[in-house]
Amino acid sequence: MVSQVVAEEKPQLLSKKAGCNSHGQDSSYFLGWQEYEKNPFDPVSNPSGIIQMGLAENQLSFDLLEEWLEKNPHALGLRREGGGASVFRELALFQDYHGLPAFKNALARFMSEQRGYKVVFDPSNIVLTAGATSANEALMFCLADHGDAFLIPTPYYPGFDRDLKWRTGAEIVPVHCASANGFRVTRPALDDAYRRAQKRRLRVKGVLITNPSNPLGTASPRADLETIVDFVAAKGIHLISDEIYAGTAFAEPPAGFVSALEVVAGRDGGGADVSDRVHVVYSLSKDLGLPGFRVGAIYSANAAVVSAATKMSSFGLVSSQTQYLLAALLGDRDFTRSYVAENKRRIKERHDQLVDGLREIGIGCLPSNAGLFCWVDMSHLMRSRSFAGEMELWKKVVFEVGLNISPGSSCHCREPGWFRVCFANMSAKTLDVAMQRLRSFVDSATGGGDNAALRRAAVPVRSVSCPLAIKWALRLTPSIADRKAER
């Protein structure tokens, strides 16, 4: 009897926050990860395991980072350059949570260099955070009260449902984008989302975009950014531009990466009407492939936002030894320039390997020019063109094919049949294994054969009516013959 009473009272010992289900862990995005962790692929010890294609992690250029560390042992050894005195004591003691000046200066220069110095970052406007997740949440706390809303173009990164909402109480209102124009953001779509928020009696505080897009793998065209900036200026709201994939954009200008701050600076009067309401989130997780270091940043020209975010950053600081190491690494300009160029080349090469492999088995992708993933159209493999059909296909791909990919519904895409497929967290050989598995699945699903009809359709399947998509396809994706010649 006593144990029964205790059992009934236990839930009351936790807060409502601890017991709520808004964290998003029940999303298929996270469920796929759980299945992978139960049965991870290994080419030697577990060759039939699940291949992780749901993780946007850059493992393509670790050798370059390790080579630099071997040449610069002082950085890891916590000594002055040239084998000088130890800095262990000063780093181990309490630090100002504004961050080490040497690191903030190096980070500001690196961010400016990534954008071709079309935007120059002021170190005093940078707030350091424990990754981009902390940066985005801190901005939510700074800009929105409980129940306020941010508009986010779809499809969007599934983790935003956790990062932006769970602890802050903020709401997300999707800006619905469609494959007909390559999922580009339009003013009518923004206006529609704003009206829907008003009908729900939500106060819209801003728009949040990822540029380059996660999950689309596309850098936002300047015209789209101008549309978004015009919208936030007209509504008197904020814009958060999550630019953590800025250094992965492998297309040459004008199809390459354009920062929201560059668009703001190009407005009449230097963007004075909106410059204090446009904020950038950055991290070193994607461009340098260092997610475990937990290094993120908020950049804002709004002094009040910088002050508030700095106070909040005390709950998620970047460790002093990490800052010291990265100050040395980012301070080596010759290295960072060569690293970024080579890393982009490797990303494009692996991207092309995935796109070519999918095309050969009759699966098309949205043409992309950035990121660590492709937005893949597998709708023709579904038994029904519905979200139930999408989930049925997803389960087959995870459990039968052994590939963890992310279904579009987890990214709030309105069109069933799209999937995010990552390519930079595995070797080329593992990607080949994934394509072999998928080919076998497609052959069995379509009755075998050479899938010639499917290959002709994969160009991409639902975006061929968009002139921009065709232009990107011709510019960014080499022919299969070219890829084989390179190999």
Swiss-Prot record:
MF-aspect GO terms: 1-aminocyclopropane-1-carboxylate synthase activity; pyridoxal phosphate binding; transaminase activity
GO biological process, one term: fruit ripening
Pfam assignment, any one: Aminotran_1_2
InterPro entries: Aminotransferase_I/II_large, Ethylene_sulfur-biosynth, NHTrfase_class1_PyrdxlP-BS, PyrdxlP-dep_Trfase, PyrdxlP-dep_Trfase_major, PyrdxlP-dep_Trfase_small
N6-(pyridoxal phosphate)lysine carried by residues: 286
Assembly description: Homodimer.
Protein name listed in UniProt: 1-aminocyclopropane-1-carboxylate synthase 1
